[in-house]
Amino acid sequence: MAKYDKADLERRMKGAVESLRGDLSGLRTGRANTALLDPIVVEVYGSHMPLAQVATVSAPEPRLLSVQVWDKSNVTPVEKAIRSAGLGLNPISDGNTLRLPIPDLTEERRKELAKLASKYAENARIAIRNVRRDGMDALKADESKKEISEDERKRAETDLQKLTDDIIKQADEAAAAKEKEILGK
């Protein structure tokens, strides 16, 4: 069993929150957000490449994304990848540029997205609690090896619980902000 390392546990917990923020940024809110296209992979030159490696994505207007494809021969594969991504976007081709108007979200779709944001947050909370459990196990192992006293273990457990609560609060705040943005409240 690994020795108790609070800095490593904190880094892993914060990693779960950053992962959550990344997942949340990919949820469509009715406003143009370049992160919406981050997960798209395009089949070009006989391999699969992230969209960011074949084009520049920008948001020139609040409800419009612009995808500037660097190589004209890749416009069709990029358009196909965007259409098949399941984001409900219909690219309009204009030379090397694809314009993506962001349609309004239906109330039903907003609720689905809010539920998805909650699910992402719950997954992050579970990951954070698993890291806490690893820390608690390491503390108990250190105590059983007589590397720390019972009082030191209890102090460290209290510390770890406070850290866990703080990090979970950050995850909940990120999810609540995204849900508010999605539901337009």
From Swiss-Prot:
SUPFAM superfamilies from the UniProt entry: Ribosome recycling factor, RRF
Any one Gene Ontology cellular component term annotated for this protein: cytosol
Molecular function terms, GO-annotated: ribosomal large subunit binding
Pfam family, any one: RRF
Keyword Transmembrane helix among UniProt keywords: no
UniProt keyword annotations, A-Z: Cytoplasm, Protein biosynthesis
InterPro entries (alphabetical): Ribosome_recyc_fac (IPR002661), Ribosome_recyc_fac_dom (IPR023584), RRF_sf (IPR036191)
Main subcellular location of this protein, as a coarse class: cytoplasm
Compartments in which it is found: Cytoplasm
Highest taxon of the lineage: Bacteria
Record GO biological process: cytoplasmic translational termination
Function: Responsible for the release of ribosomes from messenger RNA at the termination of protein biosynthesis. May increase the efficiency of translation by recycling ribosomes from one round of translation to another.
Record family assignment: Belongs to the RRF family.
PANTHER family: MITOCHONDRIAL RIBOSOME RECYCLING FACTOR PSEUDO 1, RIBOSOME RECYCLING FACTOR
Name of the molecule in the record: Ribosome-recycling factor
